[in-house]
């Protein structure tokens, strides 16, 4: 057993203390206090989420100078969690995407990704991502696999902190 006090087990997707109990970061506790002091009305949000949050999130993701954003060609919706967002995306793509109904997931991918997309009605394929020997990105394998995927394929890319490896592409 590793007793180093700097060690944190993130295998379950949450911080845990040395007894295996949930550990809430001080910054999260402070955010909770600030939100509680705002005296929010606790009303339900519209089904697609908080419109100002969506606008700010789209601007953050695409950039304020994004042509599609300026032309109102970006649609957003708010969901609960990454799992919820993947399920909404999978359902939407299975019903409305007119092309290839296969989604390509990185290898490895989080354990629930495959069933989420399968249960949404998509076929799941995989592309190379992680290299165990270098403990990094297998860029050559990833590019090869994505190049060999059919045109207009659906590809799940992690914007940062690839789940479960934490390995991100670099600008190089």
Would you name each region that the model predicts?
Residues 29, 39-172:
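Conserved core of the PLP fold type I
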Residues 1-49, 56:
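N-terminal "arm"/small-domain region of PLP-dependent enzymes with the aminotransferase-like
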